[in-house]
């Protein structure tokens, strides 16, 4: 399953982020948030994206724990102590598949890119059958929700996937998470099928890149 806290990316009218290469191997997202200052929203100019390291695990696990508590309060029973657990996150880091968004030198969002997916993905009518990656465990810290970070994090995942040469991103989205569904649909992800996991029904979604 993918995301609970991608719901954080509810920033309509935002210009696409521009991504440039950082000399230390990070991606810099230069962000201009038009009109948000008048709404009391935080006005960020930069996020730093990088691969997660073993020493990040404690902060990453805390971020997911906070997100799970927030989703529970919002009536979104998508994640729990079973998934995503600390072992799963540790393996994501060890395999070099987890990426962090740092805001003010603290992890603010996380995503995972790999080629792992449930056999039920065969239910999807995929437009791109061969050249793709799968987006998992997209999570935005509750402390920065509703400030556009969900959208920016998805954009960073798309940019990374494109840089790796693939033509599409796939994901599964919990049907009881309206915030995530709205985010993905607005960003051009198409519903291509249905699956049922332990926590209930999910949509299979796909976006062709480039």
Residue spans of the language-model regions?
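Alpha-helix boundary/capping motif
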Residues: 4, 12-15
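Conserved N-terminal entry element of GNAT/NAT acetyltransferase domains
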Residues: 31-55, 210
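Acetyl-CoA-dependent GNAT
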Residues: 54, 67-72, 78-143, 154-155, ...
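C-terminal "cap" of GNAT-fold acetyltransferases
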Residues: 127-132, 167, 173-181, 185-187, ...
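Conserved acetyl-CoA-binding loop-helix of GNAT-fold acetyltransferases
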Residues: 140, 146-159, 182-186
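Conserved GNAT acetyl-CoA-binding A-motif
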Residues: 154, 161-172
């Amino acid at each position: 399953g993918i995301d609970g806290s991608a719901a954080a990316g509810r920033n309509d009218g935002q210009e696409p982020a521009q991504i440039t290469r950082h000399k230390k191997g990070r991606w810099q997202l230069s962000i201009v948030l038009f009109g948000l200052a008048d709404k009391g929203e935080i006005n960020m100019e930069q996020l730093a994206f990088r691969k997660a390291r073993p020493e990040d695990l404690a902060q990453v696990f805390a971020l997911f724990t906070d997100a799970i508590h927030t989703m529970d309060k919002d009536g979104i029973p998508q994640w729990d102590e079973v998934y995503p657990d600390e072992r799963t996150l540790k393996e994501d880091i060890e395999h070099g598949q987890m990426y962090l968004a740092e805001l003010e030198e603290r992890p603010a969002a996380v995503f995972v890119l790999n080629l792992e997916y449930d056999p039920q993905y065969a239910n999807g009518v995929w437009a791109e059958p061969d050249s793709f990656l799968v987006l998992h465990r997209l999570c935005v810290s509750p402390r920065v929700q509703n400030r556009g970070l969900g959208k920016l994090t998805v954009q960073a995942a798309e940019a990374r996937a494109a840089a790796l040469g693939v033509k599409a991103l796939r994901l599964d989205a919990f049907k009881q998470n309206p915030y995530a569904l709205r985010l993905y649909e607005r960003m051009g992800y198409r519903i291509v099928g249905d699956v049922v996991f332990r926590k209930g029904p999910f949509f299979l979604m796909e976006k062709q890149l480039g």
